Amino acid sequence: MTVLVTDTGFAPDDWIDGYIPLVALSDTPDELYSLGIDLTRPELDQRDLDRIKRVLPRTGLIRIFVRSFGDTSALTLARSLRDAGYEGRLRAHGAMLARFYTFARRAGFDEVELTPVQARMQPREHWRNELDWTPVYRVPRPRGSAKYSGTS
């Protein structure tokens, strides 16, 4: 059974409407249910991105596959969808590490989907959204601090 990671901890998966792969996505509105879109690759060409943008108002959840621990394209896609006005749920799944949860949340993901094995290997207490976290490159350097010159 799938385990979801949110800012409140672990929770069971509550999405009941299923997923549609991008290739099966129709432009015809279907008001009977909220769409769940399953993106198996985070790189989309402009045509696919436009297609998703057209159905955003009736999309309840978009699940984006993270291929490897260093794959930032899923984060970029999440940010692009938020910038396009998507307000529904964004879910990351695949190769996710607890220490990247803050990155995922800052990119626009609402939750992370784990397999039972992933949840056992990375328990609830490892998944924290560090609200006061700032990337090292954004921390202002104190005035007059020594800079590395490359010489001894």
Feature annotation, model-predicted:
Residues 1-29:
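N-terminal, charge-rich interaction modules
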Residues 3-14, 37-45, 128, 147:
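Phosphate/adenylate-binding glycine loop and adjacent helical scaffold
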Residues 18-23, 33-40, 60-64, 88-92, ...:
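Hydrophobic faces of well-ordered beta-strands that scaffold small-molecule active sites
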Residues 34-83, 132:
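Glycine/Thr-rich beta-alpha phosphate-binding loop at enzyme active sites
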Residues 49-54, 97-111:
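Catalytic cores of alpha/beta
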Residues 76, 80-82, 87, 97, ...:
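Long, distal/terminal scaffolding or interaction modules
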Residues 107-127:
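Glycine-rich phosphate-binding active-site loops on the catalytic face of alpha/beta enzymes
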Residues 121-150:
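C-terminal helical cap(s) of enzyme catalytic domains, especially alpha/beta-barrels
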